[in-house]
């Protein structure tokens, strides 16, 4: 058995209850995948998006619904080490990625106020646009259960408002496009266990604010979201 096959098997055996069943629960409950969909699975290079890619591959193998997948990697300005790490991990995991470039890190590097927020918005815009060019009608992001809770807390503590991260939503600016979050019910602790059991090493956020920990994939970087984790 190839190593990628062992990693795939662990998702539906060792982590069947904690990861696979929670993934399926989200997909079914929110009707995320439909007949004829072409879904761009957006890969940042971290543990969450890489797990999402593997789960979506497994879903395509086992589900009766007919749908297509594209595994989309946007290079926002990674250094050569991080870029190569993503390519190597995709090869290890048997994920056929499509990679394209943008200058997001260069732009965000000049912004002092809320750079992480601006970076996230710009990333999503580029991903929507590229996915549309490739004929996709949906993008899938790797946000998990902890991200949902942290978003609510961040809104309450920093924005004085109640806001949440929806499991799926229609794009306001890209007609016909929808965003889905299939890991909506999967907890980060279980993703970390999956990563460690399979001895996988992914990149963390790799902009100038967090580059000192890009290879550790264990948080850090001083963002508001990281403050929530602590």
Model-derived regions, located:
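Catalytic subdomain that performs nucleotidyl-dependent activation
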Residues: 147-229
């Amino acid at each position: 058995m190839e190593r990628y096959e062992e990693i795939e098997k662990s998702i539906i055996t060792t982590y069947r209850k904690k990861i696979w069943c929670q993934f399926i629960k989200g997909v079914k409950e929110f009707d995320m995948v439909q007949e004829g969909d072409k879904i761009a699975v957006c890969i940042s290079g971290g543990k969450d998006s890489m797990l999402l890619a593997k789960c979506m591959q497994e879903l395509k193998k086992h589900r009766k619904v007919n749908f297509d997948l594209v595994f989309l990697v946007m290079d926002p300005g990674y250094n050569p080490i991080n870029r190569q790490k993503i390519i190597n991990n995709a090869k290890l995991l048997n994920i056929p990625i499509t990679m394209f470039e943008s200058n997001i890190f260069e732009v965000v590097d000049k912004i002092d106020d809320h750079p992480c927020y601006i970076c996230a918005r710009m990333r999503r815009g580029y991903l929507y646009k590229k996915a549309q060019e490739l004929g996709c009608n949906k993008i899938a992001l790797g946000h998990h259960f902890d991200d949902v809770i942290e978003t609510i807390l961040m809104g309450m503590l920093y924005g004085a408002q109640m806001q949440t991260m929806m499991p799926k939503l229609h794009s306001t600016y890209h007609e016909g496009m929808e965003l889905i979050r299939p890991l909506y019910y999967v907890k980060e602790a279980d993703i970390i266990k999956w990563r460690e059991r399979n001895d996988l090493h992914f990149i963390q956020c790799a902009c100038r604010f967090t580059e000192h920990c890009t290879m550790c994939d264990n948080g850090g970087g001083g963002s508001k979201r990281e403050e929530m984790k602590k």
